[in-house]
Curated annotation (Swiss-Prot):
Any Pfam family hit: UPF0270
Family listed: Belongs to the UPF0270 family.
Entry protein name: UPF0270 protein VC_2612
Amino acid sequence: MIIPWQEIAPETLDNLIREFVLREGTDYGDIEVSLDEKIAQVRTQLQSGQAVIVYSELHETVDIKCHPF
């Protein structure tokens, strides 16, 4: 089930994005990207619709999926 990012409390959204970025790793290619920059990139992807927040009822987990879904 897709959860609109606008319906998530700001602090919860911040924590969700941070956890996603840390879990995905830090290999961004030739250019080093700071944690804050990567968090901002994911937030922008959510706002633009390039990423969505997905809740799995089966596993009772929340994840961020980037395009393509």
